[in-house]
Amino acid sequence: MATEFIKSCCGGCFYGETEKHNFSVERDFKAAVPNSQNATISVPPLTSVSVKPQLGCTEDYLLSKLPSDGKEVPFVVPKFKLSYIQPRTQETPSHLEELEGSARASFGDRKVELSSSSQHGPSYDVYNPFYMYQHISPDLSRRFPPRSEVKRLYGSVCDLRTNKLPGSPGLSKSMFDLTNSSQRFIQRHDSLSSVPSSSSSRKNSQGSNRSLDTITLSGDERDFGRLNVKLFYNSSVEQIWITVLQCRDLSWPSSYGDTPTVSIKGILTLPKPVHFKSSAKEGSNAIEFMETFVFAIKLQNLQTVRLVFKIQTQTPRKKTIGECSMSLRTLSTQEMDYSLDITPPSKISVCHAELELGTCFQAVNSRIQLQILEARYLPSSSTPLTLSFFVKVGMFSSGELIYKKKTRLLKASNGRVKWGETMIFPLIQSEKEIVFLIKLYSRSSVRRKHFVGQIWISEDSNNIEAVNQWKETVINPEKVVIRWHKLNPS
């Protein structure tokens, strides 16, 4: 009985407080509503709201957020505007015309220079690396008719789009005309060593000028032809301009017929190699390409980059029939012609790596000091993983291995590795015919070491630079002789 009496008393107290609270809130709200004529929020009657008695809460939360002076609470809906979508048919955006970058200015100046002394002739678009003047699919020409009012000229790396300048029906005769090429200076380079070589007269024993192509040659004596290119470096905008002119006296297998389709593939041996390709031409004694490729490359990278050309047949089947290469460290800001000797494609991987070595004969201490300084033109990895390189050195006396040492393993950066290590090899009076065998290896984290190339340092070496370095070292004791050496694949 006592328990039920206490419950009824407590319930009456709470119920009474709740009714008083509801009555006071309803009275305040009715007094506030007439003061706001255009209230945008409608509140349902308090009788429909179930107010649960809670300890410590004196009023409803939503009602406490209403303005105390009865101001209108607006509800604003944001206005949405349609965004502008650039039409796809607009091929020359107006904002590009306002861009006067160094690359665009250089391209415009170059175009004016080429067009200043042009002659009427076939209109070759040399700035388009994939331009094909005579090889256009009939199906594409029907579906996409040519539009003469818009021309897009571009290089392979830099986007150099600009309107075609008026008055340029052909190319500059001073740059691309080969009819007077005999009167101009052409520097001929060996494709392997990139050393200028003399052009000997092609005469037989009777002194006639009969071409040696009529004589059947075999093996290494055969002439595979020459590739004529034009190069120069624009240092102001850090661009290299490569113009493939023509391929002369090219030989191909007889199974390919009399007129196979030939193209030139170029490679810049950067850490991430850059590839470009000319249009396909019909094979002949002198294949004209006349195509220019523009690439952005920093000046310091020219010391470590080689330019490799591969001559490929497209029909009757795709195959590399010749290759040639040259170093870019001697590239000039003046435009120069190069004639590269084409060699047969190697069946093994071509090694373009070079190693800088220093030698010193210390006669007082009876020892030879060998310095492994630096390597360049290193091959890049086909995977995202960076290759590391090291050098192994072996000292031989009379054909027997006496000492062997190696450098530490270092990662390549921009195709270069700098060791700067010095190795000491003691000498004994009985030791004769000293020979050093130096090998370069690469290693990745997913496979074993891989042989890159090697060089013999001795007076009997097959490398002229190695022979000269060894002779100078022996003749001049205590003198450090430093030379760059191109590594051989075997």
Curated annotation (Swiss-Prot):
Residues 189-215 are annotated as: Disordered. Residues 223-342, 344-471 form the C2 domain. Residues 192-211 have a biased composition (Low complexity). PROSITE patterns: C2 (PS50004). It comes from the Eukaryota. Keywords: Nucleus, Phosphoprotein, Repeat. It is found in: Nucleus. SMART domains: C2. This is Tandem C2 domains nuclear protein. It comes from Homo sapiens (Human).
